[in-house]
């Protein structure tokens, strides 16, 4: 029920850009199921995104949450120049809608003034993805993206404004970032930043057509020492579930309960909604 309700009360996700200039070792957006008909690095810009959003919001008869960036990172380097995301945020604030923003980029701080306005009028939630607390490891896993220490700063500055932050803990890759030191480091960031919740439903990467081949290529390139381990343990497995998954989940649950952080997926996703309110 909570998930069904959440879908009903959110406008269809707005992905202003399709594709990405980053080169993360694992990237689900590269899967063929997302039906991208061009090279992933050849970024598709939805030039009329602002006008289309304005038109959609004018027609809506009930307030709801609008999601930006659940499939593609909205704050790619190109956004610094085009500012399409910022202009879309202005429309959301103008029409008094709520916002769910997915990002792992420090560029989001550029728009903290608008995020703050949206949050004061309705609700603003920022979902930040984290996979490691180690900056040096992140440079290999997610080259070009904002470092974990920078994302921690982003989370802190958002929560200081009263903006809700939820951490998407993903991906946790076997033999790479599934050690308990890394998990505890990630949880420490969450506790210190005062996040509302932690999502773990995408923690275990799923290899699909389109991203599987590239994942193993990147694995061999960046982590050649463990390539054979993957071949031996996972072979043709679709889901890369770490062997210490149970221990990781127990650690997350214990930490969240001790610090009042939500770890129940249904509770966090339900929080992404707004009470139904008809526009007069």
Model-based region annotation:
Residues 1-7, 11, 271-280:
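Single conserved hydrophobic/aromatic residue that forms the stacking wall/gate
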Residues 5, 181-272:
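Auxiliary Fe-S-binding modules of radical SAM enzymes
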Residues 5-8, 12-127, 135-139, 148, ...:
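Conserved Radical SAM active-site core
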Residues 41-45, 80, 142-150, 178-182, ...:
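Alpha-helix N-cap and loop-to-helix initiation/capping positions
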Residues 45, 107-109, 174-177, 206:
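Acidic-and-aromatic substrate-binding clefts and catalytic sites of carbohydrate-active enzymes
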Residues 91-97, 153-165, 193, 247-264:
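A structural motif corresponding to the C-terminal end of an alpha-helix
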Residues 121-134, 198-203, 224:
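Non-cysteine beta-strand/loop elements that form the S-adenosyl-L-methionine
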Residues 133-135, 142-144, 158-179, 203-205:
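Conserved strand-turn element in the central/C-terminal portion of the radical SAM core barrel
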